[in-house]
Every structure is written in C-alpha cells, then in structure tokens.
Amino acid sequence: MTQAAAPQPWSDRFETALHPAIVVFNASIGFDLALIEYDLTGSQAHAQMLAEQDIISREEGEAIVAGLEQIRSEYRTGQFQPGLDAEDVHFAVERRLTELLGDVGKKLHTARSRNDQVGTDTRLYLRDRVDHIRQQLRDYQRVLLSQAEQHLETLIPGYTHLQRAQPLSLAHHLHAYLEMAERDWERLGDLRKRLNTSPLGAGALAGTTFPIDRQRTAALLGFERIYANSLDAVSDRDSLVEFLAAASLIMVHLSRLAEEVILWASEEFRFVRLSDRCATGSSITPQKKNPDVPELVRGKTGRVFGHLQALLVVLKGLPLAYNKDLQEDKEGLFDAVQTVESCLEAMTILFAEGLSFQPDRLAAAVEADFSNATDVADYLAARGVPFREAYNLVGRVVRTCLEQGKLLKDLSLAEWQALHPQFEADIYTAIAPQQVVAARNSLGGTGFEQVRSALASVRQRLEATC
C-alpha cells in the first residue's frame, strides 16, 4: 500500500515529489521509531550545547528542550504517532517540534547531520540494552548457580561424541555454563567501553563551521570520549558488529544448554522433568509434554547469526562515509536485542521453576555403563603399569564384559587378579561412581572439593556485581 508523499526537509532541491511507492521503500520510521527516546535525549543535549555556545539564544535552547520533552510525553501517551511520510524518526521529531515552536524548532538541526545524529541515537540505545542484557546474564547465572549448589553430589554421565565417557558432578556440568555466561558478561562489558564514544558533532562527515563543544554534548549524554575523526564517526558500525558477535555467542551458549535440556527431558534420558509452567502439549498425542522453551531458544539462535552475517555483508563494500545501505543496520540489531533478551528471560525461568533434575534416574544411568573404565587404567598406572598398556588391557576387559552382559563392578576379585596381579580388593572402591568423581580433584576438575570451591568463587563474583 502506498502513501502520499509529504514535503521533506530536503524537498526544495527537487522539482517533483518522491514517488509514493518510493516513500514507503525509503522509509525507516516503521522500525527506527524504537530510537525515539534516545533521539529526543540526544537532541536535548545538542540544543543545550548550542545555547551554551551562543549559536542559538538561551531562550531558544530552553524552548527546544521543553518542546522535545513535550514530544516525549506525547509519544508515551500515544498522542504522537508518526506515519511513513515522516521517512525516519529524526524527521518525525523535527517536524513535530516545528509544529510546536515554529521557526525556533527549525534551529535544532544547526551544526548537526542525520549522520552523526543516528550514530548517537544508536549508541545510546545499544548502551542501555547492553546494560540490561548484562543484568539478565547475572540473573541467569544466579539461577544456574542455585541449581548447581543443590546438586553438588548428584552425578550425571559426562559425554564425548554423545557417548558416555566419564561421570561428572551435575554441579560441574552446570558450572561450565556459568563460566560461558561469565565470558558473555565480560565480553559485553568490553564492548560497552568502545560503545561509549560520542559521534555527535561530526556532522555529515567533515565536522562543522559552528563553534560547537563536542566534549560538552558527550558529557551531557554520559559518553566517556568523542570520536577523534569525523569521517570515522559517521562511518563506524564496529560496535554493532561487535554486539551481534557477542549476541551470537550468548545464543550459542544458550542453544547448547537448550539442546541438552531437550535430550534430558526425552523418555530415553529422563534426567529432568519439565513442569507444566514451561512445557506445552500436543494437538494429537495426549501423553506428551513438549520442551517448547528450549526448542525455541535453539531455533531462534539462527536469527541472531543471520543478523551478524547480514551486517558484515552490508559493510564490506561501503566507501566512506554514510551510504543509505547503513539503514539496514537497525532492523537486525533491534531483532537481535529482542531475541537475546527474550531467550535469556525464558531460560532463566526454565531453570528457576520449569524443570527438576531426577537424581535417581541420573544415578542409575551412571551405574549402568563403563564410564569408570578410565579409572581402572588409572588404577594400574598408579601402580607402575605403563598407561597405554593399562588402557589396552581395560579395553579388552570392557569387550569381555559386554560379551558376558556384565559391568566392571560385577567382576569377582579373582577375575580381576586373573587380568593383572596388581588388582586388589580396593579396585571396587576405585570404580564406584562417587569415588570416580571425587578422585578427579585437579584444579578445575569435577572432584567435589574443586566444584565446591569453584561455585563459591562464582557466588562471590555475582555478589560483587549485584
């Protein structure tokens, strides 16, 4: 559906109006309205600086700041709802300000371009969202930590190649995801430092002839520094790429845990039970309880990956400085932010109240396999048998047990000693699952003391950043 073209601030250069279909095609107001609060804040800082520098009068500056605040109120109450004819959020605000203030409103854009304006708005927006996502990561970590602390001595099979390898403390398994989330939190913190740089005052690309104070607007908006090069200031989208890369890694980590929950909730595993609060039913099979939350997290991950790739492709061939291609940086950014925030919230709820681990089922799984085989080899190696020789011997023992339908614990002491004279009665203690886990007490290992210490460090870290 097309919409009649309205005059734009640049219309006097042209002899005919923009084609109605191109108005729609060109407009970004349908999505960049998400920046309106930041656009208003940035414009208020700009107007204040213009007045302080005597570029406009003090009275004009105060009127503009008040007018922008009125627009903010109108937007929040639904009275101000710009349409596609506004082209973008910046023109929409300027048009409404001019309606309120007349010619005074037209002075707001003095010494400013949409190029430095949109860069400022986007950084203000992303700075807020980064802070929010970092807080969400902390909330998610607290829930995982609570689960881990409850299950320090609960055992779970540890897998490589999705084959049972060695038993683990369930807390150790969850601690791995806590560490992934910590890296995500730190990565966003590093990004925020670079994000906190103001492009405002760079103009279209070359600066301005007016005696502006860029440091002042940066301070008013809470930026720590300004861009040193005006051309770089309006061309740079590094922080958006960095965010999308960091967001992609967050989603990788959430998706891996989601995949495990999906497996654990299956009838074949039954390691967790899903609560009614976080599962759905089937339209045809009444017995089912579907793990929709982790499945959606897993599915939404690809969206964020796609937004990262899309922005990289947009940027790779762009000459400096601004090109209309850069309008394509925002929809993917906004969607990625919303996706990460919703997935973090959903996974936090899932682990807070949406699932319960089944220790008996987990213990039975650990008991009924050969994941203690490495400990038999270690037992012999600790008694002087070369590890590779011990490894090969245990491999033959496992094959024999499989042929006879036995587990290692089912072998008699005589059978053990027939395999190698170094075996003593304490072999049964060495291969008991709790001992297998407890014995791995190397730094960072799954031994209970190591895990207890690791979780204490995590809790200390979280409490320090409440």
UniProtKB/Swiss-Prot annotation:
PANTHER family: ARGININOSUCCINATE LYASE
Broad enzyme group: lyase
Gene3D superfamilies reported for this sequence: Fumarase/aspartase (C-terminal domain), Fumarase/aspartase (Central domain), Fumarase/aspartase (N-terminal domain)
Record's protein name: Argininosuccinate lyase
Family the UniProt entry places it in: Belongs to the lyase 1 family. Argininosuccinate lyase subfamily.
Domain of life: Bacteria
Cellular component annotations (GO), alphabetically ordered: cytosol
Catalytic activity: 2-(N(omega)-L-arginino)succinate = fumarate + L-arginine
Location in or out of the cell: Cytoplasm
Source organism (scientific name): Synechococcus sp. (strain ATCC 27144 / PCC 6301 / SAUG 1402/1)
Biological process according to GO: arginine biosynthetic process via ornithine; L-arginine biosynthetic process
Gene Ontology molecular function: argininosuccinate lyase activity
Database matches in CDD domains: Argininosuccinate_lyase (cd01359)
InterPro entries assigned to the protein according to its UniProt record, in alphabetical order: Arg_succ_lyase_C, Argininosuccinate_lyase, Fumarase/histidase_N, Fumarate_lyase_fam, Fumarate_lyase_N, L-Aspartase-like
EC number(s) stated in the UniProt entry for this protein: 4.3.2.1
Known pathway: Amino-acid biosynthesis; L-arginine biosynthesis; L-arginine from L-ornithine and carbamoyl phosphate: step 3/3
Gene that this polypeptide is encoded by: argH
Keywords: Amino-acid biosynthesis, Arginine biosynthesis, Cytoplasm, Lyase
Keyword NAD carried by entry: no
